């Protein structure tokens, strides 16, 4: 339903449960993100159209981002949440830094996160910070177009560079 992620902020998706097959035939160039998690329950396939996607503004300036929730607790997918974030040029996302390595609902849940980045124009970049309270991890990465970052644990936050639209698919 869109030629680039920057064209329409409501992606359509398809949930395919375990032990099933799916064939995709495209009429033109297509880029697909395959997102998965472990699940033992049997669930049904589900088409998730634009009207299922929830758009939310998260944070406040200068750390605000527009986020779309594509696959969430209202889908047949269990143990999987997928969304997209659009970060305003020069803004922070996920600030103040947060983490997902302690079971303390509703403030925090245990979850690994992966971000897939795209920029417009493509030579753009973001800075991804990752650290732990004890200092065992304390890193900042320059993330470029078409790159992934994984957060198995620890605090993380992202800053978008001025002059570039920053997008990341998150799960």
What is the meaning of each model-derived region?
Residues 2-20, 48-51, 65-67:
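Short acidic (Asp/Glu) patches
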Residues 12, 20-22, 28-32, 80-83, ...:
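Generic beta-strand structural signal
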Residues 7, 135-136:
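Short alpha-helix capping/helix-loop boundary micro-motifs
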Residues 29-89:
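Surface-exposed beta-loop interaction hotspot
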Residues 1, 84-88, 107-134, 142, ...:
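Short, conserved beta-strand element in jelly-roll/cupin
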Residues 7-27, 37, 142-163:
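Conserved metal-binding segment of the jelly-roll/cupin
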Residues 43-48, 69, 80-83, 92-100, ...:
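A short secondary-structure junction signal
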Residues 161-171:
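Non-heme Fe(II)/2-oxoglutarate
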